[in-house]
């Protein structure tokens, strides 16, 4: 069976097709929302418009890589997180498109959330089938979250730590836009950071499993005002994020010793962040950027799981 996944976040319009028999992603496509120069994202009404305009074209593109007539179930992320009160209008575009597609074909529709899609994609990409049935710590680090989650697969999720103010992706994007890059700016910030050879001593404001990142933005602004190079400032920003995550994970492991840590979310696409954490944290799992940043792969996998067509993953 093939399953369809659609995710319409505040960053990108994403679609994916999953083959349950082969246990692999047949194809996926994504288009970032257009953001005007100097702006930090879109209003929800504008995001909803751009998703609605992009979906037919992307569905046509998806059809070039997969037989859409063979799809037996569909999934759509209907809201940001699986918690009461979680709502964002931009997700209406994707779940409505998924509902229309499934109704026209007479196939099941699975409603899930953006965060659960991220978790499923990360666990799948880590190629650890056992993760779906055991406890693990999962970081979801993006422009809208800096959440530390205690999970038993993508279904049972408990948020045990988060940022009390600014999210990691917001700090990164604000620095990138400040330097003249288009939003989202994470890739450019990471590129500049990787070019910096100067040593950096990162700082972190962490209390238990919660953190504060508003001071990071202020420090980056101060560095630029003092004449520090963009490369140094970007490296400082990303390493501070990485050190923050390391300390949050260390606090969580004191309460939940021995659990693996899986990283998901767009910020975790940065090689600078990954290298820092890999050198300092045992039993951690990072996934390729295709599965870390916003995508519909996890949604298509969750659709397969919910209709009883769970793939066989290599351990």
Where are these regions (language model features)?
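Glycine-rich phosphate-binding/hydrolytic loop that grips phosphoryl groups
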Residues: 118-122, 287-315
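N-terminal phosphate-binding loop and adjacent alpha-helix
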Residues: 33-64
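Short beta-strand-loop/turn "lid" adjacent to the catalytic site in phosphate-handling enzymes
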Residues: 57-96
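Short glycine-aspartate micro-motif
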Residues: 3-6, 70-72, 90, 136-140, ...
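A short helix-loop
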Residues: 8-9, 16-18, 23-28, 130-134, ...
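Conserved phosphate-binding catalytic cores of ATP/NTP-utilizing and phosphoryl-transfer enzymes
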Residues: 1, 107, 111-137, 301-305
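Glycine-rich beta-strand-to-loop/alpha-helix junction loops that act as flexible
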Residues: 73-76, 142-144, 262-270
């Amino acid at each position: 069976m093939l399953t369809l996944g659609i995710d319409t976040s505040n960053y990108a319009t994403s679609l994916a097709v999953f083959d349950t028999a082969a246990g692999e992603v047949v194809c996926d496509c994504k288009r970032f929302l257009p953001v005007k120069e100097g702006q930090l994202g879109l209003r929800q009404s504008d995001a909803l418009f751009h998703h609605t305009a992009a979906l037919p074209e992307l569905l046509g593109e998806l059809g070039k890589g997969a037989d859409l007539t063979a799809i037996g179930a569909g999934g759509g992320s209907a809201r940001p997180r699986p918690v009461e009160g979680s709502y964002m209008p931009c997700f209406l575009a994707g779940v409505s498109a998924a509902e229309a597609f499934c109704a026209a074909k007479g196939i099941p529709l699975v409603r899930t959330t953006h965060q659960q899609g991220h978790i499923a994609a990360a666990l799948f990409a880590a190629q650890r089938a056992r993760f779906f049935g055991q406890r693990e710590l999962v970081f979801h680090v993006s422009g809208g979250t800096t959440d530390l989650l205690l999970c038993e697969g993508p279904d049972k999720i408990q948020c045990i730590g988060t940022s009390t103010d600014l999210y990691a992706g917001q700090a990164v994007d604000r620095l990138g836009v400040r330097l003249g890059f288009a939003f989202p700016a994470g890739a450019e910030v990471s590129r500049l950071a990787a070019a910096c050879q100067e040593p950096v001593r990162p700082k972190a404001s962490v209390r238990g499993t919660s953190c504060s990142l508003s001071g990071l933005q202020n420090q980056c602004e101060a560095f630029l005002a003092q004449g520090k190079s963009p490369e140094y400032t970007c490296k400082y920003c990303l390493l501070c994020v990485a050190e923050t995550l390391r300390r949050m994970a260390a606090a969580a492991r004191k309460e939940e010793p021995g659990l693996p840590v899986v990283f998901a979310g767009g910020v975790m696409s940065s090689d600078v962040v990954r290298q820092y954490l890999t050198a300092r944290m045992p039993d951690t799992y990072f996934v390729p950027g295709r599965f870390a940043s916003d995508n519909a792969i996890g949604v298509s996998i969750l659709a397969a799981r919910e209709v009883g067509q769970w793939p066989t993953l290599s351990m």
